[in-house]
């Protein structure tokens, strides 16, 4: 976008303004704040700006008030110091003045958005001279307002926010300062196996946490009591362990854990060595010795990639492991990139978000990029850029 003349052009910008809401009020405006520089740049260049976004998961093709972007339009108006009208039937066409921005109502209210309907994508493309894809968080979805319109617009380009996200991730994965340490938490090996396998070729150390660690511990012959575990993935975990050893990747498992008989606010939490977990106990966090080991690895790291908490941080008694890890990452001189909804919620809880080098709000796209997948919207933008260069 920064290479184009936007003056007097109809510029359609796809942002990710999918902010959390409670009772019609925005509870976290991080995604809106991140989108502002791109929108401001277009307004300053006297473009005729149309902003697109989705919000939540409404029934496609149907207006549902709770998923309306009205609260977002109000906040944008405040942040941009100009009235940003919310336009409902924008597909019929809308007149925008140079230097003005409008917000188009939730793209998911349009039938055909999710399955990337060609007619819908072409209609969106007709409404603009330039399409700017700035929403990395939706780049992994081939939908009408992302990859679809990018294919048919007269001119399609990447926005500054999308570029910054791709550059941050590429810096961590393609040309990292060594040693590269990855932390992969979460409850299931099955949802993170592609990520783990892709990271294995890149990292020096790989820390697994949460339910994923339980599956690895059980595969190594430890008793994990009633802990969350995927028994059908024990063989895969064992094979992965062997592969890591072959590639000289260190996979430090917990040496001590925090256990309880049940998961509740008033559960009696006890620190146990990993070989002392009884059959009626469940593991809900890592213990202090494990945290100390992880902190040492963070201090020595050149680059840190973190996705997923390593304990049930929402409950105070089981939050120490994730808290200690977040503090160690914050303290480290390493370049740190952190993503995933639960991880961001943990950082928020511990007031450490701004101590990370780069925080990705992208969720699924962050994960798929780390898995080594080519994201549909980025693929089409790359193709369009090549076409443009050849002209």
From Swiss-Prot:
Substrate binds at residues 16-18, 31, 54-57, 108, 141. Pfam families: PGK (PF00162). One of its GO terms (cellular component) is cytosol. Signal peptide: none annotated. One of its GO terms (biological process) is glycolytic process. It is an enzyme of class 2 (transferase). Monomer. It is found in: Cytoplasm. It comes from Coxiella burnetii (strain RSA 493 / Nine Mile phase I). It catalyses: (2R)-3-phosphoglycerate + ATP = (2R)-3-phospho-glyceroyl phosphate + ADP. This is Phosphoglycerate kinase. Keywords: ATP-binding, Cytoplasm, Glycolysis, Kinase, Nucleotide-binding, Transferase. The keyword Lipid metabolism does not apply. The gene is pgk.
């Amino acid at each position: 976008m920064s290479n184009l003349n936007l003056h007097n052009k109809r510029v359609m910008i796809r942002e990710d303004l999918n902010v959390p809401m409670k009772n019609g009020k925005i509870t976290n405006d991080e995604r809106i704040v991140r989108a502002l520089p791109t929108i401001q740049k277009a307004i300053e260049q006297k473009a005729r700006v149309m902003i697109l976004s989705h919000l939540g998961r409404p029934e496609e093709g149907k207006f549902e008030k709770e998923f309306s972007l009205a609260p977002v339009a109000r906040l944008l108006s405040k942040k941009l110091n100009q009235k940003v009208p919310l336009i409902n039937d924008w597909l019929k066409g809308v007149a925008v003045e140079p230097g003005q921005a409008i917000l188009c109502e939730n793209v998911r209210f349009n039938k055909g958005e999710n399955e990337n309907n060609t007619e819908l994508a072409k209609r969106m493309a007709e409404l603009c001279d330039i399409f700017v894809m700035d929403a990395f968080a939706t780049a992994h979805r081939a939908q009408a307002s992302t990859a679809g319109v990018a294919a048919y617009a007269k001119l399609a380009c990447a926005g500054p926010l999308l570029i910054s996200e791709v550059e941050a991730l590429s810096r961590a994965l393609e040309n990292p300062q060594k040693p590269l340490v990855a932390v992969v938490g979460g409850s299931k090996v099955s949802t993170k196996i592609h990520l783990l396998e892709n990271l294995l070729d890149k990292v020096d150390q790989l820390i697994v946490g949460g339910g994923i660690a339980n599956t690895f511990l059980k595969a190594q012959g430890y008793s994990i009591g009633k802990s969350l575990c995927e028994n059908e993935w024990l063989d895969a975990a064992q094979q992965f362990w062997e592969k890591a050893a072959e590639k000289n990747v260190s996979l430090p498992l917990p040496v001590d854990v925090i256990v309880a008989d049940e998961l509740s606010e008033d559960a009696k939490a006890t620190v146990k060595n990993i070989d002392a977990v009884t059959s009626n106990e469940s593991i809900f966090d890592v213990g202090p010795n494990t945290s100390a080991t992880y902190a040492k690895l963070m201090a020595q790291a050149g680059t840190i990639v973190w996705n997923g908490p390593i304990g049930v941080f929402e409950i105070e008694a089981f939050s120490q492991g994730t808290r200690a890890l977040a503090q160690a990452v914050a303290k480290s001189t390493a370049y740190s990139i952190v993503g995933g909804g639960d991880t961001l919620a943990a950082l928020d809880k511990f007031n450490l978000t701004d101590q990370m080098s780069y925080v990705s709000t992208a969720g699924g796209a962050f994960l798929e990029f780390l898995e080594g997948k080519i994201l549909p919207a980025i693929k089409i933008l790359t193709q369009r850029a090549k076409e443009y260069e050849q002209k």
